[in-house]
């Protein structure tokens, strides 16, 4: 776990988060997750057996000492808003603590959607100014990671930066999906290009590029000035990565913060964990990794808990069916309210209230809340969306052509099943 260095003033570590406000950009649709995000924004997608993706950014804020948070919403925000209202309403108004929901206001140009990530903040500037923060922490609400933002704040102040960008090396073949930077010996950013077709390699490792994680810290007054200027620029795309960060880089005011310095992990020798889970395969793989014997992401660390909305559910139950078959599981996450009757579940993640009936075999599957699996089903390498009713005898994940005809099948062979897909096949979704 991250610890302050001995020469770091403890008072600074305590005061900087109090002087900060975090703004979580949570309006993204996440189109690469296909039908998983038709009715919910990507930050509201379920993850890890009981959480939503946005819980990680919110928990990082709380654990870092930042208790003034704005969540900027847009696409299909109802599920996200409901989750935050139910699970994140424990703040003390008397202590000036809050999670403020900031939907698209159409204040500036009367458009239906935010024009870019920077415009999402600009449209809410009148509200954000009232927070009277000295520092603004800009976060994406759709990434899985654990980070101590107070350590990044200290780095920001000690370097005398006006803007600090969290960064980490990524394989050069994947770098086109990120903002890529070059830094000098003092970690000042000397070049920044958003999603380049030919990403430059790191001088120390030709196989990797230094990528922005979309995590920024700004001096508040400086940020407001930049956003107002950007808003007047008709040629701008009003995006942090495309417009704001390159401009600050040209002015020599942007610094990089290596993610390993503030990444929170139980094993100090492990690789820093950060996942985008932006594709179906990445989402499926990140969920299943949590069910492994030693997952890369430790969610059992009591020093850095991941919080969420907690439902009052009975414990999971594994029962013997009438034929004598035992319900059993191996290397899996099984949440509260689940019942497994006379079936085998291996290397899978079952969210709350999943019911698996007799003679089923569930292998390498992610079953979202309220899924009901009929008798004698075989489910493999799949993601089953919330409240799906899988009919008796259905087989998923064994025949590529059949899977692609009935459902969505990714190039990597991961199958996504939704209620609408099952209805089109004539299967009733009420039980």
UniProtKB/Swiss-Prot annotation:
Beta-D-fructose 1,6-bisphosphate binds at residues 39, 429-431. GO terms for biological process: glycogen biosynthetic process. Alpha-D-glucose 1-phosphate binds at residues 114, 179, 194-195, 212. It holds the Pfam family Hexapep_GlmU. Its EC number is 2.7.7.27. Signal peptide: none annotated. The keyword Nucleotide-binding applies. The keyword ATP-binding applies. It catalyses: alpha-D-glucose 1-phosphate + ATP + H(+) = ADP-alpha-D-glucose + diphosphate. AMP binds at residues 40, 46, 52, 130, 386. Keywords: Allosteric enzyme, ATP-binding, Carbohydrate metabolism, Glycogen biosynthesis, Glycogen metabolism, Nucleotide-binding, Nucleotidyltransferase, Transferase. The record marks 74, 113 as: Could play a key role in the communication between the regulatory and the substrate sites. Pathway: Glycan biosynthesis; glycogen biosynthesis. Gene3D superfamilies: Hexapeptide repeat proteins, Spore Coat Polysaccharide Biosynthesis Protein SpsA, Chain A. GO terms for molecular function: ATP binding; glucose-1-phosphate adenylyltransferase activity. Allosterically activated by fructose-1,6-bisphosphate (F16BP) and inhibited by AMP. Homotetramer. HAMAP family: GlgC. Belongs to the bacterial/plant glucose-1-phosphate adenylyltransferase family. Involved in the biosynthesis of ADP-glucose, a building block required for the elongation reactions to produce glycogen. Catalyzes the reaction between ATP and alpha-D-glucose 1-phosphate (G1P) to produce pyrophosphate and ADP-Glc. This is Glucose-1-phosphate adenylyltransferase. The lineage of its organism: Bacteria, Pseudomonadati, Pseudomonadota, Gammaproteobacteria, Enterobacterales.
